[in-house]
Amino acid sequence: MFISSAYAQNTETSLEHIKNVAERIDRVFPPFDFVHFGSHLFWLAISFGLFYLFISRVIVPRIGGVIETRRDRIASDLDQAMRMKQEADIVVETYERKLAQARSQAHVIAQTASEEIKQKVELERKEIEANLEKKLTDAEKQIAKIRDKAMKSVGSIAEEVALEIVKKLIDVEVSKESVRSAVKATGY
C-alpha cells in the first residue's frame, strides 16, 4: 500500500491527541462541574433578567402597539362600514320613494289618458249619433214628401187608368168628376 507523507503525519498527531485525552479523562465537563454551578446560576439570572427587560421594554410595547393599531383599524373599519350601510340604506329608501312616486305618477297619467280617451270617444259617438239622427230625420222627411207626391200622383194616375179601363171595357165615357170621386172614396 502506498502511504503518503501527509497520512503518516496525521497518524502522529492522533497519537498525541490520545495522550492528551488520557490525561484529562478524570476531569468533568465544565458546565456540569458543581464547582462552577454558582457562577452559572448567576449568569443565568443576569441573562434571563436582561432578556426579560428587553422583552418588557421593547418587544411587548411593540406588540401592544401593533395590537392597538389593529384594534383601532378594526374599529375604524367597522365605523366606516356602519356609515356606508346607513348611506346605502338612505339611498335605497330614496330610490324606493322615487320609484313609488314614479309609479303613482304613471298610474295618474294612465288614468287621465284613459278618461280623456273615454270622453273623446263618447263625444265622437254623440256627434255621430246626432249626425245619423239628423240624416235619418231628413231621409224620413224626403221619403214622406216623395210618398205624398207619389200618393198625389197615384190619385191622378188612378183616375186616368180608371177612365181608360171603363172606356175600353164598357166602351162608355165617364166624366172625370165621377171617376175622381170614386178614386177619392178608395183613399187615393
Swiss-Prot record:
A GO MF label: proton-transporting ATPase activity, rotational mechanism
Subcellular location: Cell inner membrane
Predominant location category: membrane
InterPro entries given in the database record: ATP_synth_b/b'su_bac/chlpt, ATP_synthase_B_chain
Keyword Ion transport (UniProt): yes
CDD domains in the record: ATP-synt_Fo_b
Topology class, membrane: Single-pass membrane protein
One Pfam assignment: ATP-synt_B
One GO location term (cellular component): plasma membrane
Known function: F(1)F(0) ATP synthase produces ATP from ADP in the presence of a proton or sodium gradient. F-type ATPases consist of two structural domains, F(1) containing the extramembraneous catalytic core and F(0) containing the membrane proton channel, linked together by a central stalk and a peripheral stalk. During catalysis, ATP synthesis in the catalytic domain of F(1) is coupled via a rotary mechanism of the central stalk subunits to proton translocation.
Subunit annotation: F-type ATPases have 2 components, F(1) - the catalytic core - and F(0) - the membrane proton channel. F(1) has five subunits: alpha(3), beta(3), gamma(1), delta(1), epsilon(1). F(0) has three main subunits: a(1), b(2) and c(10-14). The alpha and beta chains form an alternating ring which encloses part of the gamma chain. F(1) is attached to F(0) by a central stalk formed by the gamma and epsilon chains, while a peripheral stalk is formed by the delta and b chains.
NCBIfam families according to UniProt: PRK09174.1
Family membership noted in the UniProt record: Belongs to the ATPase B chain family.
Protein name, per record: ATP synthase subunit b 1
Organism: Bartonella henselae (strain ATCC 49882 / DSM 28221 / CCUG 30454 / Houston 1)
